[in-house]
Amino acid sequence: MTSSLYRRIYSGDSLYSAWRKVKESAFSSSSETIRNEAKDFESQLPKSLSDIQRALSKKTFTFQKQTGVAKTKANGNSRPIVLSPIPNRIVQRALLDALSRIKFVKEALDTPTSYGGIRNKRVSMAVADAKEAISKGAAFHIRSDIAEFFTRIDKARVVELVAPHIKCPDTLALFQAAITTDLANIDVLRRQGLDEIFPLGVEGVAQGSPLSPLIANLYLHDFDKTMNDGDVICLRYIDDFLILGKDMGRVDRAFNKAQRELKKLSLHAYQPSATSDKASRGLTANGFDFLGCFLSAGLIQPSTITRERFKKRVKSDLDASIRMMKFSIEAGDIFPKGSYSGALQNLDRVILGWGKAFSFCSNGHWIKSLDDYITSALAQYEMEKTNLFQKTNGTAQRTMLGVRLLAAVHSERTEME
């Protein structure tokens, strides 16, 4: 007999709520492919959700193959991101909502010093709690993150953690399937030598899955409890953590304890050093980076690394648009994201998303500095676009602008008929 927990997963209310959250995330994505996939799914409602509900109720739902994307990090290494089809994400989200009602899971998510991937908790809260601890006398810190965290998670251990509390074979089987990675483009990644960074075996969970933050918080629940039972405070946001204490000795001992706890999970944290951007150690009065912010006395602002990364993203997107406009002229076709109008819309979304993410930071010169940079980058972009314009005719100019030709629309319709 189907359990109430499993029935909750495929209830109409649960699936529709999951779709709303997936839709919000997809529509705000800078990826046109993801936005279009969500639009296609929405255009087929309510059938698209009914199909998922029917498959789940009959226990025939299967997760579609995902796409692996090797995202280049600032240090030149690749971060494995797994992009799942909309139906996968809806079921993962519905599963997340159902599991979040289980007592064991609720206790883990209620941990006061854990912030990432938890409803109604945000980066700003972790930063605010760090500032409060400093104001109460925490004069020293160690900040670090757990090396290769998501790719080192033992999936079998995750299942062992939740199985005694789920007590439903159907839900457990769905959970196991939901955290399994099966890539459609694995051959391409293998030829590029990138297949080994993806969580295809017993180790690792997909970054990008709605379930990944939950798994992280369950996996590190004992770590959170152990690290906050002494005379320091340890704030954690997924795989980043900050230890604050009244003297350096206490903080150092706490960090050594953190390494011992992580070793039990076959994990380790980066050692603080003057040359590393992964970890830091010292006086809180001197300021330090945490969760993309720089914290110092009376001031919270995006860190230098965060701001440089944002500027690089702005320039990279505008440069890519110029290249794609040139290609559009040669191909005689529109590439929306690379067109003039598409590039400006994309940049506006990037600015809005980044600005909201750091809206809790203190006002300061950094805001004007970034706005000045964007204005300068746009002026350069406008100049390059104008140079291209002067070398083309009206039809090519329309293509560059991202405004399709009526004749092309008519031609497409004729071909379909």
Language model region names:
Residues 1-50, 55, 385, 395-398, ...:
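Non-catalytic, polymerase-adjacent accessory regions of viral genome-replication enzymes
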Residues 5-8, 96-154:
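Active-site-proximal segment of RNA-dependent polymerases
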Residues 34, 76-80, 111-113, 144, ...:
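Glycine- and acidic
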Residues 55-76, 97, 175-195:
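Reverse-transcriptase-like RNA-dependent polymerase core
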Residues 78-110, 200-229:
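Conserved pre-motif C helix in the palm subdomain of viral-like polymerases
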Residues 93, 196, 225, 252, ...:
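Right-hand nucleic-acid polymerase module
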Residues 132-238, 242-261, 282, 287, ...:
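Conserved polymerase palm-domain catalytic core
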